[in-house]
């Protein structure tokens, strides 16, 4: 898995959208945003003990599969547009890439997009309340296992949702410390120039 800050171009969403020069984002930075990641053996997902361990520890007791491509997904154009609309969920979004590749974009505390490139074997968890979106890359294909705790619910809440209790929890748990540091830094700069 690789991640980087996106440029502001409105070009094809399937392009990498690197800044110039590229600004890569570490796994540690993603973890600060609540993003979890594992690299697993996608060819043996049915019997992989590591996947079973993760599922048991995190309570992922339901799975289904999705293939995202113009040929495989009914109402492809409508669905890919919906996936790319900035939104949040009240539950984690858990995806295990079994084949192909695609991008999950997530907002950082300063509201900048971070693009996360997932490929075969990558399992990613986006935290509940995080603003994010998904698109295929230029390969135009992804097969993923979707995991859920309990009954599968995939209800997107399009931005803005800042008053939603789950969004507030996400801000308090993952963004508040960073935002407080920015406020202190700005206050210090303002005091120094006054």
Curated annotation (Swiss-Prot):
InterPro entries, per database record: ARD (IPR004313), ARD_euk (IPR027496), RmlC-like_jellyroll (IPR014710), RmlC_Cupin_sf (IPR011051)
Annotated pathway: Amino-acid biosynthesis; L-methionine biosynthesis via salvage pathway; L-methionine from S-methyl-5-thio-alpha-D-ribose 1-phosphate: step 5/6
One record GO biological process: L-methionine salvage from methylthioadenosine
GO molecular function: acireductone dioxygenase (Ni2+-requiring) activity; acireductone dioxygenase [iron(II)-requiring] activity; iron ion binding; nickel cation binding
Function of the protein: Catalyzes 2 different reactions between oxygen and the acireductone 1,2-dihydroxy-3-keto-5-methylthiopentene (DHK-MTPene) depending upon the metal bound in the active site. Fe-containing acireductone dioxygenase (Fe-ARD) produces formate and 2-keto-4-methylthiobutyrate (KMTB), the alpha-ketoacid precursor of methionine in the methionine recycle pathway. Ni-containing acireductone dioxygenase (Ni-ARD) produces methylthiopropionate, carbon monoxide and formate, and does not lie on the methionine recycle pathway.
Full protein name: Acireductone dioxygenase 1
Region (Disordered): 1-21
Binding site for Fe(2+): 87, 89, 93, 132
Binding site for Ni(2+): 87, 89, 93, 132
Entry EC no(s): 1.13.11.54, 1.13.11.53
Family according to the record: Belongs to the acireductone dioxygenase (ARD) family.
Keywords per UniProt: Amino-acid biosynthesis, Cytoplasm, Dioxygenase, Iron, Metal-binding, Methionine biosynthesis, Nickel, Nucleus, Oxidoreductase
Catalytic activity reported: 1,2-dihydroxy-5-(methylsulfanyl)pent-1-en-3-one + O2 = 4-methylsulfanyl-2-oxobutanoate + formate + 2 H(+); 1,2-dihydroxy-5-(methylsulfanyl)pent-1-en-3-one + O2 = 3-(methylsulfanyl)propanoate + CO + formate + 2 H(+)
Keyword presence, Nucleus: yes
Organism this protein belongs to: Physcomitrium patens (Spreading-leaved earth moss)
Cofactor note: Binds either 1 Fe or Ni cation per monomer. Iron-binding promotes an acireductone dioxygenase reaction producing 2-keto-4-methylthiobutyrate, while nickel-binding promotes an acireductone dioxygenase reaction producing 3-(methylsulfanyl)propanoate.
Subcellular location: Cytoplasm; Nucleus
